[in-house]
Every structure is written in structure tokens, then in C-alpha cells.
């Protein structure tokens, strides 16, 4: 039902690209200059804020973030939504994948390794109490899914990772 409610959003934004999945929305622009990107994004976010008001929806401003693929030194603009500045971050988690400003997925690889290592630590602590079959089941249940989800990204890991 929610998808039907927000289906016209794609037609509302003219300069920005939009990715929708369930209640997750990503709005992004691709431009040649940094100034142009900030201008287009701010223009589109004004349209987006008006659309939200029309639909009687609120944006969760604590989950709004800006990631750019340029160095911080090149970036001195601000993105605003409904008069509030949107936080600029180095990486975001989107649908379980860490996206960083370099788009090299190092952040995601490290994030996946940390999550799996914590679960492996649990397995090591209870190791002596489990049969071989139970160990395999715990591995397949707790650890393997971290490597299976978006596995193709993990192939981008550097040799030291």
C-alpha cells in the first residue's frame, strides 16, 4: 500500500535520480561540477519537501545524509531539506551495504568482516559444548549469511583484507 502512496514521487523529481525499496528512498544527482550538484540537490529537495507536505508525510531527518564522491576539500556547499542542514558523512548503510565516498566498498568489506568475526567469537566460546553437526549449523546460521549477502562486493576486497 505504501508503494502505491509514493509511486508518483518519481514523476515529481525532474533532475534527481530516485531509488525506492520498501520505505527506503535514495535521491541522488550526477553532475559535472560540485556547485551544480548542490544546486540541483537543494532544488529537488525543496520539491520533495513540498511533495511530502502534500502527502502528509514526514521525513526522518535523523536518517537523511549526504555522501559525495569528491574529497572534502572540494566540498563547501550545504544540502538542506525543509530548512535543516543535512549531515555530510563518509559512508552510509543502504539495504545492508556500506557505501563510501570512494565507492570502493572497503568500508563494506571491513563492516562484514567485523560482524562475522564477532559471531565467530561466539562460536569459539561455545565450541567445546557442540557436536560437529551443531558447529556446522551454527556457522551456517550465524556466520555464513554475512558473507553470502552481496557476496560479489566482497570480491572487491584488497589483498590485505
Predicted segments — roles?
Residues 1, 28-34, 79, 83, ...:
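Short, conserved non-catalytic motifs in the polymerase core
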Residues 1-15:
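Conserved pre-motif C helix in the palm subdomain of viral-like polymerases
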Residues 1-5, 41-44, 112, 119:
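Hydrophobic alpha-helical membrane-association signature
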Residues 14, 21-22, 53-72, 94-161:
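Non-catalytic, peripheral interaction segments enriched in hydrophobic/basic residues
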Residues 14-16, 84-85:
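Short beta-strand/turn micro-motifs at beta-sheet edges
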Residues 19-21, 26-28, 58, 80:
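Beta-strand cores of modular interaction/reader domains in eukaryotic scaffold and signaling proteins
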Residues 26-53, 70, 104, 156-159:
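Catalytic palm subdomain of template-directed nucleic-acid polymerases
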Residues 43, 57-90:
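Short, conserved micro-motifs composed of acidic
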Amino acid at each position: 500500500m505504501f508503494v502505491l502512496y509514493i509511486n508518483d514521487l518519481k514523476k515529481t523529481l525532474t533532475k534527481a535520480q530516485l531509488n525506492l525499496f520498501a520505505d527506503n528512498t535514495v535521491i541522488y544527482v550526477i553532475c559535472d561540477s560540485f556547485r551544480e550538484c548542490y544546486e540541483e540537490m537543494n532544488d529537488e529537495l525543496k520539491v520533495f519537501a513540498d511533495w511530502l507536505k502534500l502527502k502528509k508525510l514526514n521525513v526522518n531527518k535523523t536518517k537523511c545524509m549526504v555522501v559525495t564522491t569528491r574529497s572534502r576539500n572540494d566540498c563547501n556547499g550545504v544540502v538542506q531539506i525543509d530548512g535543516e542542514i543535512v549531515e555530510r558523512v563518509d559512508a552510509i548503510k543502504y539495504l545492508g551495504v556500506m557505501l563510501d565516498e570512494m565507492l570502493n566498498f572497503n568500508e563494506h568489506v571491513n563492516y562484514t568482516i567485523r560482524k562475522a568475526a564477532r559471531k565467530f567469537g561466539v562460536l569459539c566460546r561455545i565450541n567445546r559444548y557442540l557436536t560437529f553437526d551443531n558447529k556446522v549449523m551454527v556457522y551456517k546460521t550465524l556466520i555464513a549469511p554475512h558473507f553470502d549477502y552481496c557476496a560479489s562486493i566482497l570480491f572487491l576486497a584488497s589483498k590485505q583484507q
